[in-house]
Amino acid sequence: MKLTNYTDYSLRVLIFLATKNSNELVNIKDIADSYSISKNHLMKVIYELGKLGYVETIRGRNGGIRLGKAPELINIGEVIRHTEDDFNLVECFNGEKNHCILSPICGLKHVLNKALSAYLDVLDQYTLQDIIMNQDHIRKLLS
């Protein structure tokens, strides 16, 4: 399964913020520059992460962003479920767009459903804290 850039950027933002002190405010430009990502793309991502409670945004001259929850409370599987548009691996997963004549008898859909469930089950076992265990190395690479 391939994650969208939107989800990739969401996870990268969370990783970046998790390597900072909990009260430290970061601006979007710093994140964009560290990852060589468009600031405009990140603004959309951060807005959504804020609505979901993963980040806290503070407006104004001395504003910025920081994690809205402790890293150990941010589940990777949950983040991915919130940021991915859909999990329609193949056409038959989408009832409205399914035109495959094999759908009524096909065993592939069942196999792919099991694979998707296993994929998400693994992601559910990890938190942001697990992902940033090597914070010192991450900080070096991001600076």
Swiss-Prot record:
Residues 28-51 bind DNA. [2Fe-2S] cluster binds at C92, C100, C106. Coiled coil: none annotated. The keyword Protein transport does not apply. Residues 2-133 form the HTH rrf2-type domain. It comes from the Bacteria. Keywords: 2Fe-2S, DNA-binding, Iron, Iron-sulfur, Metal-binding, Transcription, Transcription regulation. Pfam families: Rrf2. One of its GO terms (molecular function) is DNA-binding transcription factor activity. Binds 1 [2Fe-2S] cluster per subunit. Its cofactor is [2Fe-2S] cluster. This is HTH-type transcriptional regulator NsrR. The lineage of its organism: Bacteria, Bacillati, Bacillota, Bacilli, Bacillales.
